[in-house]
Amino acid sequence: MIYLDYSANTPADPQVLDRFCSVERRCIGNANSHHQAGTAARAEIDAATLKIAALLGVQPAEIIYTSGASESNNFALKGLARLSRHAGRHIISTPLEHSSVSGTLTALQEQGYEIDLLDIRRDGTVDLDHLKELLRPDTIAVAFTLVDSELGVVQPVEEIAAILKDYPNCHLHVDATQAVGKIPVSFEGVDTMSLTAHKFYGLNGIGLLLKRRNLALEPLIHGGESTTIYRSGTPTVALASSLACALELAVENLPERSASVQKRNAELRAALFQHPEVRINSPENAIPHILNLSVRDVKGTVFQRELDAHGVCVSVKSACSSDGLPSRAVFAVSRDRRNALSSWRISLSHLTTEAEIQEFLRVFDVCCQQLTAAHGDR
């Protein structure tokens, strides 16, 4: 099997697994308990929180542990909406968002909130002039993904944050799920930010919501203080510690890992450009970890299934998106519905080898000949 779907899930790093197992065996107490075992568990989770805070440049009190980015996005957007409901009910986002953002905004819209979506430029970035046009005194939030999961485009967070300084009632939420471990991530100028460990070689089931200390969101789970007043319950100490380990590895090894991925991406682009029926949808300014393409007149779902039959794992859209619909992200940059329906995504890792790329290209050639010939026969 050749795995080229690292944007959907990454394998846990062996050091992360070792950390989890070690802490799980050693810390048997409830971190909320006032005895030796509880104190030891509390010390472990406090150490993890301090490490995470240092790596992300935030204060420990700004860290909320969650089950993952979907929970973090829901928590942030619903919390900001409720917090600011007396100041306004207008929210701005983009058509590129993960379903945990777009779905939450749809739910808020049904509660009377007004949602506007930003125009997307042909390079995949948001139209900042359109943002300025949409902003109003009653705009309470702008929400966008830092790195698009389908195209790999990086949004200009610093410029967006600068624009919002003139709107004191407006908060900025950033979904950094696909960014951590791929590009440097800063919380500067941001009010809330979501991320999840399983995207940077950590374990499933643990994520973070970063929240400015001065924001008093309604608790996600009521019942008393745990690691924070915002999410009651017994903290999973080993998961928190494993996230800190994964984050440390991701930050420390970012330059080396990115260089490896850039090399694999260049090999792919050079080979795929030789196919006249292939259209590369990811712009040149996209991160190298994500390469989105379309094969003319062959639906992305069809090509993905054929590759899977040959032992190659790729994705059509985000793993959490609905099947059968064209990619919103690809349509936004190409304005071509057929092209969007034909699109699929290769996502790379520092673990991806040159041999895997060469084998993928061999399989791709076989699938491309079969599927384009089948279309031509109709």
Question: Where are the regions a protein language model picked out?
Answer:
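Pyridoxal 5′-phosphate
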Residues: 1-378
